[in-house]
Amino acid sequence: RSLGVGLNIQPNAVRELFALGIAADLLDQVGLPVQEWALLGLNGKEVYAEPRGTFAGYNWPQYAVHRGNLHMLLYQQVIERMGPDAVKLGARALGYDRSNPKQPVCHVQTGDGQEQSYKCTLLIGADGIHSAIRSQMHPDQAPIHWGGAIMWRGTLRAKPMRSPSSFIGLGTHQRRMVIYPISKPDDQGLSLINWIAEVTVDSSGGWQQDSWFRETKLHEFAHHFEDFNYDWLDVPAMLKAADCAYENPMIDRDPISSWVDGPVALMGDAAHPMYPTGSNGASQAIMDARIIGAKLIAHGIGPRALSGYNAELCEPISQLVLRNRSAGPFGLLNLLHDRCGGVFDDIETVIPAQERDTFMGKYKQAAGFAKDMLNAAPATIAVGATV
């Protein structure tokens, strides 16, 4: 079943999906191309705005999608191409055994609670931020890192703001809203709108809730945003109209020295869980998979391919994890808060245009989706290439 709310797929990852035959005709069923990315101050005035995807001259769009619907689309594509037995639902990895260096064994618990073991040539751990594969590979890793930000997420049906598909960040580092549509407007002009409400608190006492993700009630957090009321947006009313709300802390893990242990590798959140400030966690997971594929073609199905993947991505993406801790592209709101408390009349007198453009350009380059670099890049995997 479809779970989750919204996420963004950056042009570098959309390029890879298109190459796999998962193009606009399919992605339009689970989301829509992003037209604009905008930051606004606490008083609702524009700090920075830019077109995104093909609207900005990229050869590929940026997509805002419903996370659960994207999962279902990818699941259906795998089943159609690889057969009904290709995916075992309800199972989770418990760990692995490398006593035979040429044939690792993955230990799995199935949905009915039984434990099974599978021999394999390569094992790719894509089991998320609580990865059992990573825990075994790096038993001395630091605990989950929480920097003090708490997020509440939800959806509602409403008219899009600013444009038919604008990604909006509003407020300050201490209190902010992220709002964007994840469906095209219906006959009444209403889209499914994804919203994220965030506050930053003192994290010295650690996360005190029993779970990392829970359903919550409006009264537990809406008071933080009572003054987010503008002539173009009434945030308190928007929150009251939401279908549901979920709470989770903004968490990641400290980077690790390697994502690979011989024939075993990590990818996605198992390798590099990162703050969602750059909207590129899902995109990087897609890139991981494609780089692994490219290395398998170059080196064959064996540890050399995984070593090549690790050599190409581990260090730069580890740096991106740390960069996202400083708020990623939302770091402009940090500057704004430091210089004027988030309230201004003329943004040019607070953060000049050249400073804003330079800040954003550095982040895009670090995240791998700077426009000219991406548009000129050769295909990750050549058409027709096989292992």
State each model region's role.
Residues Q29-V30, A86, D227-C244, G302-S307, ...:
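Acidic/histidine metal-binding catalytic segments
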